[in-house]
Amino acid sequence: MYKKYFKRLLDLIISLILIIILFPVMIIVAFLLLVNLGFPLWNEKREREGKNKKVFIMYKFRTKKLNSEKLTYRNRYTDFSRVIDRVRLNELPQLFNVLKGDMSLVGPRPFIPGDNLPEGEISAKRYLVRPGLTGLAQVNGGRGLTHKQKLEYDVIYYDNLSFKTDFKILLATITNIFKIDRD
């Protein structure tokens, strides 16, 4: 019942409240990133696969320098943009994706269309729910996990999807935001 009816309702209510509360923060972050990195403000080509493999544009502030693919990881960011990336403030615009219904607050993180993911039941389960702003994989290793490990966490999430699971993941996400990771 939660997955079918209440999850989306909670996504709508919570994302709207968070957008209202955090909008001034988004404006300040956008301005400071503009000063630090210039235009464009948004990451380009942010197509992602969502529920039922529907492709959507994921909103996210740009924190890397333009044409930085050939630079070392450390040189891709300014000091300021690295901080924004580490505390995930660049992800705040995804609240609009949640409001639109492309994403949920909690769920598997969306993959890029065409990523070489294994076929079969494990991979298919992740597409039965909306992708999330945060998820079980993000609170259990995030960027340090392989695609296979992320898929395993996605299946665990799907099999245990409940209000309690979502609440625990949201609390763990808030805790993780305030931990400083060292690159």
Predicted regions and their residues:
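Short glycine/serine/threonine-biased micro-segments
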Residues: 22, 48-51, 99, 105, ...
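C-terminal terminal-structure detector
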Residues: 2-5, 12, 127-183
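A short, structured surface patch at a secondary-structure boundary
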Residues: 71-130
